[in-house]
């Protein structure tokens, strides 16, 4: 009998300890499940406003995309296009014209010795450029070399002792000098006019391009200013949505729990109540089993 009593007492303690362990495990699992379920429900309730905010954010993105499309397109069309059309085109036209003009002036300079009158007539029609200083120097060098060649030829053909024949050479020198002076004056009078016209025209075109560029910037500025406002409103709505969702749920649950309606306290409280009920049931089973063991040990 003593052995049975001791065994029953040992069994009772083992059973109690086992139930306590199981109770702690179940209570911990139920508390964790309740906490996880409350978090999930709060996340599910907060998903619709976050989706709406995501939609408004997409609207802000489309607005920014529209700004990028129209603004950058306007810049590419009006700004860069104007620069390519007027700036680069003017440079290409004036640059190519400069090379052609300088070549034409070099050709007329080379032919000045043969036909000064015809070359003087050609000189206004030739396009003058920024390289007019080199062309005038070429013209003067060509005229001087041609005059020196003629004088040298005349000096060789005419004998030295005949003073009468040398007088026409002096007259020829004077006429050639006069023609050279006139030609230089004509080239100098023609060069600044065309140079001023050509130098003014390319500067006017970049000014027009610069004037067109600020207009593109002005058209670009209001759109770019409107895009951050859309983004700001999207973020503003998102912040208010995230703030307003959770406190309302907590306040409602607190009000319902303070009123005494335990059924409406929410998922977290109901699950916690269930876990506490299960723990109390386990305690009741332990007590019943203990009494039964003691009764059998005592009466047997």
Curated annotation (Swiss-Prot):
Entry's localization field: Cell membrane
Lipid-carrying residues in chain (GPI-anchor amidated asparagine): 274
Membrane topology: Lipid-anchor; GPI-anchor
Region (Polymorphic region), start-end ranges: 44-226
Amino acid composition bias (Polar residues), ranges on this chain: 167-193, 200-228
Major subcellular location class: membrane
Signal peptide segment: 1-20
Record's compositionally biased regions (Basic and acidic residues): 149-165
Glycosylation sites: 22, 36, 177, 249, 273-274
Sequence repeat ranges, renumbered to this chain: 51-58, 61-68, 69-76, 77-84, 85-92, 93-100, 103-110
Disulfide links within the chain: 257-265
A Pfam family the protein falls into: MSA_2
One cellular component term from this protein's GO annotations in UniProt: plasma membrane
Presence of keyword Lipoprotein: yes
Domain notes: The N-terminal region appears to be involved in lipid binding.
Summary of the function given for this chain in its UniProt record: May play a role in the merozoite attachment to the erythrocyte.
Name of the protein described by the UniProt record: Merozoite surface protein 2
Chain's gene name: MSP2
